């Protein structure tokens, strides 16, 4: 039975036998697409709960036999239950994970590493989101394992409020990031003040 659980194996290169070369992730998806909802197309009008965050995010995928996004989606569908970080930051973490894995990975031994370093504009609904000035340092490994396959997902996200101007992006609702956000049950609602943005409810 396939189960999601916290660390059961470590993603190390020191294996007793040399694994088969990892195959490249599928390239039939868009490579790097910006967030479709959380960075506005135009100037945000409702500035009350808007905050710029300087983000460093890394998602490292360890799999001796290669992996597919089907497996990653399977892992992330249980993200709500295994997330060990600050609950007030979970929406931000979900956005960063989706964006990172929408990018092009860099091979690192038997791992594939996705990184993102951006200034992102986030807007939370009233009473949601981090406290003013709150920072996040989050690190976790989630694994999926059965008799035939092993995939380890190492996630690291650091976020702090900053005053650097966030960039304006285009919306693409068909991005891989949107698919992963749906898998992680990202909770949002459209802003009443700005049709180009959605509010994070978590």
From Swiss-Prot:
Entry superkingdom: Viruses
Motif PPXY motif, residue numbers: 35-38
Signal sequence, renumbered to the chain: none
UniProt keyword list: Host membrane, Host-virus interaction, Membrane, Phosphoprotein, Viral budding, Viral budding via the host ESCRT complexes, Viral envelope protein, Viral matrix protein, Viral release from host cell, Virion
Region (Essential for glycoprotein binding): 115-151
Membrane topology: Peripheral membrane protein
GO molecular function: structural constituent of virion
Gene Ontology CC annotation, any one: host cell endomembrane system
InterPro entries listed in its UniProt record: Rhabdo_M (IPR006870), Rhabdovirus_M_sf (IPR038617)
Subunit structure: Homomultimer. Interacts with nucleoprotein and with the cytoplasmic domain of glycoprotein.
Family per record: Belongs to the lyssavirus matrix protein family.
Domain comment in the entry: Late-budding domains (L domains) are short sequence motifs essential for viral particle budding. They recruit proteins of the host ESCRT machinery (Endosomal Sorting Complex Required for Transport) or ESCRT-associated proteins. Matrix protein contains one L domain: a PPXY motif which potentially interacts with the WW domain 3 of NEDD4 E3 ubiquitin ligase (Potential).
More info: Most abundant protein in the virion.
Protein name: Matrix protein
The organism of origin for this protein: Irkut virus (IRKV)
Encoding gene, per UniProt annotation: M
């Amino acid at each position: 039975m396939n189960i999601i659980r916290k660390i059961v194996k470590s993603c190390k290169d020191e294996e007793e036998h040399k694994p088969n070369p990892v195959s490249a992730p599928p390239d039939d998806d868009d490579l790097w697409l910006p967030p479709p909802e959380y960075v506005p197309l135009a100037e945000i009008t409702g500035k009350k709960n808007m905050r710029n965050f300087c983000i460093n995010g890394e998602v490292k995928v360890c799999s001796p036999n290669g992996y597919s996004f089907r497996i990653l989606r399977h892992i992330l569908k249980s993200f709500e239950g295994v997330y060990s970080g600050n609950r007030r930051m979970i929406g931000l973490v979900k956005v960063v994970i989706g964006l990172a894995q929408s990018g092009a990975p860099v091979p690192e031994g038997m791992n594939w590493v996705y990184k993102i370093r951006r200034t992102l504009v986030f807007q939370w609904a009233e009473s949601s989101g981090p406290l003013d000035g709150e920072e996040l340092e989050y690190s976790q490994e989630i694994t999926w394992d059965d008799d035939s396959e092993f995939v380890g997902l190492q996630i690291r996200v650091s976020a702090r409020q900053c005053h650097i101007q966030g960039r304006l992006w285009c919306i693409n609702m068909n991005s891989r990031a949107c698919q992963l956000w749906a898998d992680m049950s990202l909770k949002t609602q459209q802003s009443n003040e700005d049709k180009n943005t959605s509010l994070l409810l978590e």
